[in-house]
Every structure is written in structure tokens, then in C-alpha cells.
């Protein structure tokens, strides 16, 4: 789970799977570690790790048979991260974005190696121009 914040998405969907969460903000990372411990104690899943790092600097943590979740800031994914994904070719991508413009920019590069399987928009902020867009992709 890249750009994981406090782990809301990754920790919710992990179940009993091995999970690595990456966050660059020190405060959010501290809260992430607290949340990881809570999830570990309630589920028994000890295969959860939180890393304090930039998402674009985690080349060795992306596996070919993994699912990568990204929920980047409005500026979108770092170009280096897109390069890493296109090199490592994880099996599936889950891309949640609050900025459809930067998401489309990133998807143009990712769809060289991935096929979009689902797109869903979410209106979490009614009466505002803000939307969230979830795109599911699978390796070609």
C-alpha cells in the first residue's frame, strides 16, 4: 500500500495476506505503526510492515505476484514510481485518486503494461467539485 497514510485502505483489505505499507510523513507513519499493531493483535496477522519512506524509493518491496495499492496526493504518482511499477510488473494495481487529471496522466503510462478492468467514481464530498476515482488494473 503506497502513499498509505495511516493505513486505512491497506489494513482494511489485507485479511491474512502479507502487507507492506509505505508512508513518507513521520506523524502519519507513527499512527500507521499504531494501527498495524492493533490489526495484528485483533487478526493475528503478523505479516504486516510499515515503512517510513517515499513511495518511489521502495523498488525492492514490489513483487511480481503482488497487488499494489496507490492513493497518491493530488499531484499523482511520482514518475519514478510509475517507472518502477512498469519494470517490476506486479500482477494487479488498485489506483485510488482524488484528481482525475493526474490519474489519467499516470494511467496513460501504466496501460502500456496493464489493462483497466474496472473504474468507479465516488462522491464522498457532495456539493463540492471533488470526487474520488478507483481504477482496477491487471497486468497484460
Regions found by a protein language model. Name each.
Residues 1-140:
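Rossmann-like S-adenosyl-L-methionine
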Amino acid at each position: 500500500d503506497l502513499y498509505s497514510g495511516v493505513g486505512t485502505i491497506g489494513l482494511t483489505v489485507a485479511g491474512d495476506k502479507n502487507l507492506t505499507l509505505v508512508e513518507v510523513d513521520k506523524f502519519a507513519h507513527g499512527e500507521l505503526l499504531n494501527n498495524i499493531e492493533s490489526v495484528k493483535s485483533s487478526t493475528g496477522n503478523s505479516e504486516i510492515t510499515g515503512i517510513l519512506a517515499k513511495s518511489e524509493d521502495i523498488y525492492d518491496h514490489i513483487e511480481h505476484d503482488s497487488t499494489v495499492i496507490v492513493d497518491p496526493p493530488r499531484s499523482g504518482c511520482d514518475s519514478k514510481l510509475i517507472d518502477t511499477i512498469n519494470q517490476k510488473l506486479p500482477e494487479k494495481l488498485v489506483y485510488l485518486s482524488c484528481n482525475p487529471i493526474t490519474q489519467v496522466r499516470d494511467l496513460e503510462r501504466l496501460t502500456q503494461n496493464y489493462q483497466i478492468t474496472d473504474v468507479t467514481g465516488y462522491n464522498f464530498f457532495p456539493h463540492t467539485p471533488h470526487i474520488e476515482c478507483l481504477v482496477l488494473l491487471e497486468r497484460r
